[in-house]
């Protein structure tokens, strides 16, 4: 497993079971959570990172897990949203060329796409090789706008279903 190879060669922290990152490390007192993506880099991958979003937009390590309901999640996010320098990182490994390895971070992704079936959104890593430097407000708006677009897509499916199968409501 990739995490064990990294652990054997670098000073990293392994996560607890079902944690919101694949590994983390600390440098100069700062916490860096990292999600590993093994991909062709040319296909769209789901970014199931709602706790990574919380960390990047609040600067706080979540006190809850991925099972938190959406109402509580959005309430916590809105309440604790504040300018900060924290981010959620991705270690991208090209499965077709293991020499092709790069890092990206949530706030500096160049392009993300809404996905109503698998929140919060998707990314094609080949389109995210070059980080975009953003001020906090720009990064927050970039992330939350795409998240909102994904939620709208999810809601649309509900309304279409209800239109044709209203007798089930």
What does each model-found stretch correspond to?
Residues 1-21, 27, 32, 38-169:
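Nucleic-acid endonuclease domains
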């Amino acid at each position: 497993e990739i995490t064990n190879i990294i652990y054997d060669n670098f000073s990293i922290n392994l996560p607890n079971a079902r944690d919101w990152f694949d590994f983390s490390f600390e440098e100069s007192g700062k916490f860096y959570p990292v999600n590993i993506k093994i991909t062709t880099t040319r296909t769209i991958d789901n970014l199931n990172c709602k706790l990574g979003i919380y960390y990047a937009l609040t600067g706080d390590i979540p006190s809850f897990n991925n099972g938190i309901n959406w109402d509580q999640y959005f309430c916590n996010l809105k309440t604790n949203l504040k300018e900060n320098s924290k981010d959620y990182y991705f270690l991208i490994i090209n499965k077709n060329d293991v020499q092709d390895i790069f890092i990206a971070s949530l706030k500096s992704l160049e392009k993300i796409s809404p996905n109503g079936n698998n929140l919060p959104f998707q990314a094609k890593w080949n389109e995210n090789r070059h980080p975009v430097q953003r001020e906090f407000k720009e990064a927050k708006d970039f992330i939350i706008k795409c998240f909102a677009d994904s939620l709208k897509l999810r809601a649309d499916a509900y309304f279409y279903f209800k239109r044709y199968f209203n007798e089930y409501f």
